[in-house]
Amino acid sequence: MADTTSTSKGTTSQTISDTAKAAEEFLSTLSDEQKEQVFYNYDDETKSTSWSNFPVTFVERSGIKLGDLGETQRAAALKVLKALLNDEAYAKVTGIMAGDQYLKDNANASDLGDTQYNIAFFGNPSTTNDWSIQFGGHHVGINATFSNGTITFAPTHLGTQPTTYTDSNGQTQSALGDMYQTAFDFYNSLTDEQKQKLYQGEEVKNLTCAPGDTCDYPTGTGIKGSELTDEQKQLLLKVIANWTNLADSQTTQATMDQISATLDDTYVNWSGATVYDTSQGKGIYFQISGPKVYIELASQDNDAGATVSGVQTSGWGHIHTIYRDPTNDYAGSVTQQKSSGPTGGGPGGSGSGGPGGSGAGSGGPGSGNGGPSDAPGRSGAPAGAPGAPGGKPGDNESGQTSSSTSKSTSKSATADS
């Protein structure tokens, strides 16, 4: 297979060791009450629904928010992420967060920003026992599970808005630009006959499998891997590596080997633009679906209320993606539960109450029917920990009013420090 791995780190065992050490150092900066917020049992099903494309103000996350930490604590939390990810992936995730801060600063999006991200541990950090990290907020949902000496990043959500912008230093930023480029490298390698099988029409579809929700892993549509040349297969693997090449080279190689072994039975389909020209059209949608991989990318035909003059924040400029392993999400530690809150991020207009919006529209933040007055808090959480949010979020990102995001979580009350 093609070399799609990072050279910045070497082995899975080293990543596990470095990440566990960084996690312990982060925990040493926290109070007992803060530790209680961070810890969950390894098999707590909360992990299956507490990641999303939505901001944390719309979908409650597990763990503790970076914005609720002191400067030293926040730096220690990010060191956990840096120990886990390779250099390219760390830059990708922090680049997404920087884009969120850009929207806060330039689009009056008060519920966004680079501190609106949560970190949680499911199980105790260890080099031998199973545990997992969940890190997420707007357009980020990292689920890294350490099990039996392996690391899996399925499922993971990565998105971005805006896809490309100029920062305060005059530098062009594009956290997920490689996703578009590698996709078109693959598309342009196909013959006309192959493109006819691949292409599903002009409509840019939304994600079929939303972050933090159940998924039926549809397959069988488009072109089959066995119909590709060896060169085309390598280009397809480079597309897939945007999601699988997140940690050390050994971890990436192990995942890619499994995907490569079943690539002939993997289908790819595509809709939307057929030329990589961000000045035209509304972007693209593609789906890669096989025995060991499920990936979707969908450009979003809405800016969710985050408008910046002269900057694309919808269409090409707003991306949602999903990566899952149909056989090994969360390393089998939990069964995916159905989301009780908003999901997806459809191509339907800007939506009332989006980031930076007034929230005055139907279903805006704080409107709608609130949850029950006795909405449960987190079992085992510190005394006085807040219960689940009562009001319904607005239609930020999805173009639809959603059900309440209230949920009960079963937390570990015996987490080691």
Show the residue positions of the predicted features.
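A cross-kingdom marker for long, charged
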Residues: 3-32, 36-71, 75-86, 90-374, ...
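Extracellular mucin-like PTS domains
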Residues: 401-412
